[in-house]
């Protein structure tokens, strides 16, 4: 599933490249996509529960507007699935715990500002952003429910659905990286970012390290 999503991202980026203009960081628009590598992290929660998140791969798509050679604003969405193991502490029976394994899905719309230090084609940059992450833990929070209906093509169809525990969190990040503008309308960027999630019931806002490799099409 994840490999298929990344393949669609790559094909979409190639298709959009046809309209890219010659290299320039003057005022204008750009479209970008990144592959994200997020490192593992352990998070402690109130009551003694904890979760260990494995390192994983995600993708990011964004639209940017360049005010000038130095300052850019980007708006987009991150998507990732992360495997985790959580230890749940019973709040009634002391010492009773349960361990669950699963994978969560996170979709995070964001807004981010980039500042380029050099006006030339190769420049280091710093970034800062905010977002809101919608997280599905895939932990069931109710019994399975079955519904049936008449489908115009398949006839009488029944399916079983089970709701899962979802949450959301305010996020903020800072980063630094390098951007290289080629002469044919492409730009490449490599960045390191630190992301914080204001998770409900966490002892403190957990932070995650991210490494991003992306391509930008300049218009």
Go through each PLM region and give its residues.
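Cleavable N-terminal export/targeting peptides
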Residues: 1-27
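Residue-level detector of bioactive/disordered segments in secreted/extracellular proteins
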Residues: 14-19, 34, 150, 160
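Gram-negative (and chloroplast) outer-membrane scaffold detector with strong preference
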Residues: 23-27, 32-41, 62-149, 180, ...
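Surface-exposed strand-loop-strand hairpins of Gram-negative outer-membrane beta-barrel proteins
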Residues: 37-62, 167-168
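Extracellular loop and loop/strand-boundary signature of outer-membrane beta-barrel proteins
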Residues: 44-51, 94-102, 158-164, 198-202
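Short sequence motifs at beta-strands and strand-loop junctions characteristic
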Residues: 51-57, 101-107, 164-171, 205-207
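Contiguous, function-dense segments enriched for cysteine-driven chemistry
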Residues: 80, 165-171, 181-218
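Low-complexity, compositionally biased segments in intrinsically disordered regions
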Residues: 145-159
